[in-house]
């Protein structure tokens, strides 16, 4: 469950290490984002020679949450922290590698590229 001002780790190789959620997209009153939702983020911590710089604003898709995601069979998939993958204006991943597992809920038309790059799909 991600809301405005939430800090997230970055699960790709764009050079960003930490981002801050500045908006949850999908309606004017929408408060929370879960796995598979798109948010606007600001880069708070970045590697010196990375593809992105500190202070830049990007779209991102949430790939892991500590709150977890409930499946249809009643199981709950939780992670140790919150993580996102940075996206460009066409909602394609900026990075060429994904670090850590992602959930099966990302397996939609829009995010198949992220699922195929991920080392593990839970």
Curated annotation (Swiss-Prot):
GO molecular function: large ribosomal subunit rRNA binding; structural constituent of ribosome
Record's keyword annotation contains Transmembrane: no
CDD domains (UniProt xref): Ribosomal_uL14
Alphabetical list of Gene3D superfamilies matching this protein: Ribosomal protein L14 (2.40.150.20)
Pfam family name, one: Ribosomal_L14
Gene Ontology cellular-component terms listed: cytosolic large ribosomal subunit
UniProt-listed InterPro entries: Ribosomal_uL14, Ribosomal_uL14_bac-type, Ribosomal_uL14_CS, Ribosomal_uL14_sf
SMART domains, A to Z: Ribosomal_L14 (SM01374)
Keyword annotations: Ribonucleoprotein, Ribosomal protein, RNA-binding, rRNA-binding
Keyword Iron: no
Protein family per UniProt: Belongs to the universal ribosomal protein uL14 family.
Subunit relationships: Part of the 50S ribosomal subunit. Forms a cluster with proteins L3 and L19. In the 70S ribosome, L14 and L19 interact and together make contacts with the 16S rRNA in bridges B5 and B8.
Function summary: Binds to 23S rRNA. Forms part of two intersubunit bridges in the 70S ribosome.
HAMAP family in the cross-refs: Ribosomal_uL14
Protein name: Large ribosomal subunit protein uL14
Species, as recorded: Acidovorax ebreus (strain TPSY)
Gene: rplN
């Amino acid at each position: 469950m991600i809301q405005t001002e939430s800090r997230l780790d970055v699960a790709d190789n764009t050079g960003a290490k930490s981002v801050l959620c500045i908006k949850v997209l999908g309606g004017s009153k929408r408060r929370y984002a879960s796995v598979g939702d798109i948010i606007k983020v600001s880069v708070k911590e970045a590697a010196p020679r990375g593809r992105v710089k500190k202070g830049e604003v990007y779209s991102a898709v949430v790939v892991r949450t500590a709150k977890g995601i409930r499946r249809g069979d009643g199981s709950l998939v939780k992670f140790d922290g919150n993580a996102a993958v940075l996206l460009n204006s066409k909602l394609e991943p900026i990075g060429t590698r994904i670090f850590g597992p992602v959930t099966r809920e990302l397996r939609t038309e829009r995010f198949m590229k992220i699922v195929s790059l991920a080392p593990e799909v839970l």
